[in-house]
């Protein structure tokens, strides 16, 4: 089935699956009305229909005729306080399993898109969302506290973006995960190495010991070295000096030992590709444990990392992830998982319908959803 239509995309999330996962996770134990599948549908529906979620917005949509038609829930009404309580206490694992299933299932729908090298890339990065410290007793403190009013605390979530779709999600709520050296490393290791996969991450994770661990685990990676990178040249890997590609002039491609803590050499080989931006002369250093690719492809693959920055901007602006609707860690995880599932649906629609921007894809997706309701629930013509 070509997933160009909203109805075709939603049909890929069958009711049978939602019920089955509900039984396996026990998300509906002791609950008769606000069941897992219904909350999942409410969150997706609300994310598509509103640019600023809140518990009162969820209440409005839940009690609307449009959502009743979308979900098939009947005429049951509820209050925002009941929805907030349910999000705080229902099992987030239900949504985690829906996310894992969606990642694998919809990846098949995009398997023929883009080149082979692009499809091998799994980018990892983190972003932060703020919430008032007066509302919660957890969160990461960043920077100096304000002179007046409560401080903001941060939630960090780290995403893997494989090919065009999110592949993993890790949420961090506590201060010891403020450093990417810990959060990003843990997220990458938790995802597990995949055959032929190229893991891409930025300077936030630069521990030489971690790079060595990744290499020993069989995890292929490409990252960027800092401007003050210190290394010991061992041997030239390939002669590339003077070659140019994609706006870069290449200087060297060699095997090196890296310095640890600025003064001690770690005797573990890494690949260093050094290039210069032709436009402004800025030096770039790419570090990797991948030896088969050309230096040009090493630099090209690292550029694919920018896709995850675009993705974060999309989910924050269009799916309003930056506005957290629940004060519990559990409720926030549910919001994040459902946001990424919604992003998967929109990405599949965007790619298969050849739409350039996420903003337009979301608008068109919502329009087609409303047209589908009108078509299916239009009054019958008198005979």
Regions found by a protein language model. Name each.
Residues 79, 123-124:
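Noncatalytic, basic helical substrate-engagement surface that gates or grips nucleic-acid strands
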Residues 104-111:
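A short, well-structured juxtamembrane/interface segment
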Residues 70-92:
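Major-groove recognition helix of helix-turn-helix-like DNA-binding domains
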Residues 1-56, 61, 88-90, 94-102, ...:
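Single, function-defining residue in the core of a domain
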Residues 64-69:
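A broadly used, surface-exposed interaction patch
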């Amino acid at each position: 089935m070509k997933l160009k239509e909203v109805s075709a995309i939603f049909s890929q999330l069958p009711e049978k699956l939602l019920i089955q996962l509900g039984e396996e996770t026990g998300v509906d134990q002791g609950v008769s009305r606000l069941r897992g599948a219904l909350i999942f549908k409410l969150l997706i529906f609300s994310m598509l229909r509103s640019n600023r979620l809140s518990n009162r917005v969820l209440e409005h949509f839940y009690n609307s005729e449009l959502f009743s038609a979308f979900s098939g829930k009947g005429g049951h009404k509820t209050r925002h306080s009941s929805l907030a309580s349910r999000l705080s206490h229902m099992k987030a694992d239900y949504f985690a399993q829906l996310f894992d299933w969606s990642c694998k299932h919809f990846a098949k729908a995009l398997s023929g898109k883009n080149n082979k090298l692009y499809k091998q890339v799994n980018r990892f990065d983190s972003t932060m969302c703020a919430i008032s410290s007066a509302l919660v007793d957890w969160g990461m403190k960043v920077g100096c506290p304000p002179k007046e009013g409560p401080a903001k605390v941060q939630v960090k979530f780290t995403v893997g973006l494989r090919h065009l779709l999110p592949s993993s999600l890790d949420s961090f709520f506590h201060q010891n995960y403020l450093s990417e050296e810990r959060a990003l490393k843990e997220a990458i290791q938790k995802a597990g190495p995949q055959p032929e996969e190229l893991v891409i991450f930025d300077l936030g994770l630069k521990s030489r010991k971690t790079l060595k661990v990744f290499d020993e685990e069989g995890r292929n990676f490409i990252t960027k070295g800092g401007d003050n990178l210190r290394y010991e040249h061992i041997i030239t890997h390939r002669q590339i000096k003077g070659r140019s590609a994609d706006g870069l002039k290449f200087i060297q491609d060699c095997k090196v030992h890296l310095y640890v803590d600025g003064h001690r050499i770690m005797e573990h080989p890494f690949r260093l590709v050094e290039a210069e931006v032709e436009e402004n002369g800025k030096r770039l250093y790419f570090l990797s444990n991948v030896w088969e690719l050309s230096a040009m492809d090493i630099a090209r693959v690292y550029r694919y990392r920018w896709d995850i920055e675009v993705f974060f901007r999309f989910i924050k602006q269009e799916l309003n992830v930056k506005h957290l609707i629940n004060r519990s860690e559990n409720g926030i995880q549910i919001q994040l998982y459902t946001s990424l599932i919604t992003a998967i649906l929109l990405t599949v629609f965007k790619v298969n319908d050849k739409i350039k921007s996420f903003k337009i894809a979301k608008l068109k997706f919502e329009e087609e959803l409303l047209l589908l309701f009108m078509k299916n629930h239009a009054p019958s013509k008198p005979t």
